C-alpha cells in the first residue's frame, strides 16, 4: 500500500444510505441519514437527543486547503498523511475538556472511526466566532497600514507584530453570504461588530438577543480552556475560530452548542512557546503551510489578491508540491495532535475500506 493510498482525499463517495445529496466542504463531507436510520441509531445507541433528531455521518478527509484552494503533492499525493485523523483527535480532546469544565455540548454524538463523527443537526449561527490573543496575520497587516478599529474595537497605538494583546479580542465575521443586513456587505467572511449582530441578531441566526452574551462567553471560556492546556505543553494559543449552533434537547428546550472543529491547526494559530520567547515564530498550525506557499511561488500576489482567483485556482490545480513539503505539514499536524492528546495518531493503510466496514458491521448504514 503506497503513501498516496493511505490518504483519504475523496470522502463524498462512500456508499452510506441517504435520501439527500452529500454536502461536500473543503475538508469534510456530510451524509444526512434517513429518518428511519436516525431514529434507529438514537434508540439502539442511546444517544441523548430527541427521538426525531436528524443525524448525519461527517467524514473528514486529508485534503489541505489554503487561500480557498485545494493543493496536492508529487507522486499522486492528494492530501496530507494523518491530517484528518489529527484534526478529529484534537477536536475530540478539546470538546471533552469543555464538557469537564462545564461549558456547552458539541454536535458530536459518536465517534465510530478516527475519520468519522456521528453528529446531530443544528441550526447554525451565521457568524465566524474569531478570538485573538496576539496581533498577527491579517490584523497586523491592517494595523501596520494605519488601521486601528477592528470589528468596532479600537486598538491602542504602539503595538508590535506578534505581541500579546492587552485583552482577548472577539473579531467576528460573516459565515456565508448574508443579504439584506444594513451596513453588512453581501460577501463571505466580512468583518462585523457586536453592534451589527445586536441590531440584526435574528438575521445572524440568534434566537434571543441575550444569546449574544452567551456565545461570547462560550467563545472566551473555550479559548481560555485551550490556551491553558496548550501553555502546559509550552505552546502559545494565538487565535482561533469557533462555530456555534442551536439544537433542541429532550425537554424541547433550545440550547447553544459548539459545532464543527475547535482548537485545531486548521482553525487556529498555535506557536511553539520556546521559539516565541526567543523572538521567533515556529508555527504548529496551517499558517506554516500558507507561508510555505507564499515563498514557494514566484508571484505571491496571486495567493493574496481576490481579483486573481482564476489564476490562483490554476496554480493549485497545475502544480504538484514537493513531497517533503507535504510531509512537513504531516509532521506538524500529527506532532501537535500527539502533544495535545498524549496518544499516537492512527494512520490506517486504507481508511475508506475501514470506514465502510465499521459503518456496515456496527451501524448498518452501508447500501
UniProtKB/Swiss-Prot annotation:
Coiled coil feature spans: none
GO terms (BP aspect): 'de novo' IMP biosynthetic process
Catalytic activity, as annotated: 5-amino-1-(5-phospho-D-ribosyl)imidazole-4-carboxylate + L-aspartate + ATP = (2S)-2-[5-amino-1-(5-phospho-beta-D-ribosyl)imidazole-4-carboxamido]succinate + ADP + phosphate + 2 H(+)
Alphabetized GO MF terms: ATP binding; phosphoribosylaminoimidazolesuccinocarboxamide synthase activity
GO cellular component annotations of the record: cytoplasm
Top EC class, one word: ligase
CDD domains the UniProt entry points to: SAICAR_synt_Sc (cd01414)
Keywords: ATP-binding, Ligase, Nucleotide-binding, Purine biosynthesis
InterPro entries for the chain: SAICAR_synt/ADE2_N, SAICAR_synthase_Vibrio-typ, SAICAR_synthetase_CS
Known EC number: 6.3.2.6
Pathway: Purine metabolism; IMP biosynthesis via de novo pathway; 5-amino-1-(5-phospho-D-ribosyl)imidazole-4-carboxamide from 5-amino-1-(5-phospho-D-ribosyl)imidazole-4-carboxylate: step 1/2
Family statement drawn from the similarity comment of this UniProt entry: Belongs to the SAICAR synthetase family.
Name of the molecule in the record: Phosphoribosylaminoimidazole-succinocarboxamide synthase
Gene: purC
Amino acid at each position: 500500500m503506497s503513501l498516496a493510498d493511505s490518504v483519504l482525499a475523496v470522502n463524498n463517495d462512500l456508499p452510506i444510505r441517504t435520501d439527500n445529496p452529500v454536502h461536500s466542504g473543503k475538508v469534510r463531507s456530510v451524509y444526512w441519514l434517513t429518518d428511519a436510520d436516525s431514529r434507529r441509531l438514537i434508540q439502539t445507541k442511546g444517544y441523548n437527543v430527541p427521538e426525531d433528531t436528524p443525524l448525519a455521518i461527517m467524514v473528514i478527509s486529508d485534503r489541505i486547503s489554503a487561500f480557498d484552494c485545494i493543493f496536492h503533492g508529487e507522486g499522486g499525493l492528494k492530501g496530507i498523511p494523518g491530517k484528518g485523523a489529527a484534526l478529529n483527535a484534537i477536536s475530540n480532546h478539546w470538546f471533552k475538556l469543555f464538557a469537564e469544565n462545564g461549558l456547552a455540548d458539541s454536535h458530536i454524538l459518536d465517534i465510530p472511526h478516527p475519520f468519522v463523527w456521528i453528529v446531530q443537526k443544528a441550526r447554525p449561527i451565521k457568524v465566524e466566532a474569531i478570538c485573538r490573543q496576539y496581533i498577527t496575520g491579517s490584523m497586523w497587516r491592517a494595523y501596520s497600514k494605519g488601521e486601528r478599529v477592528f470589528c468596532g474595537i479600537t486598538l491602542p497605538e504602539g503595538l508590535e507584530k506578534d505581541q500579546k494583546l492587552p485583552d482577548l479580542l472577539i473579531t467576528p465575521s460573516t459565515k456565508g453570504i448574508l443579504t439584506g443586513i444594513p451596513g453588512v456587505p453581501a460577501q463571505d467572511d466580512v468583518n462585523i461588530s457586536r453592534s451589527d449582530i445586536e441590531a440584526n441578531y435574528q438575521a445572524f441566526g440568534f434566537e434571543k438577543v441575550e444569546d449574544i452574551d452567551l456565545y461570547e462567553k462560550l467563545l472566551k471560556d473555550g479559548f481560555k480552556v485551550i490556551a491553558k492546556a496548550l501553555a502546559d505543553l509550552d505552546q502559545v494559543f494565538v487565535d482561533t475560530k469557533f462555530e456555534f449552533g442551536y439544537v433542541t434537547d429532550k425537554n424541547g428546550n433550545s440550547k447553544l452548542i459548539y459545532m464543527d472543529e475547535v482548537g485545531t491547526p486548521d482553525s487556529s494559530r498555535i506557536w511553539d512557546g520556546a521559539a516565541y520567547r526567543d523572538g521567533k515564530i515556529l508555527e504548529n498550525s496551517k499558517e506554516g503551510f500558507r507561508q510555505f506557499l507564499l515563498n514557494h511561488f514566484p508571484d505571491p500576489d496571486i495567493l493574496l489578491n481576490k481579483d486573481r482567483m482564476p489564476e490562483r485556482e490554476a496554480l493549485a490545480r497545475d502544480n504538484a508540491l514537493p513531497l517533503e513539503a507535504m510531509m512537513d505539514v504531516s509532521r506538524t499536524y500529527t506532532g501537535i495532535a500527539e502533544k495535545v492528546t498524549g496518544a499516537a495518531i492512527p494512520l490506517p493503510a486504507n481508511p475508506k475500506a475501514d470506514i465502510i466496514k465499521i459503518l456496515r458491521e456496527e451501524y448498518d448504514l452501508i447500501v
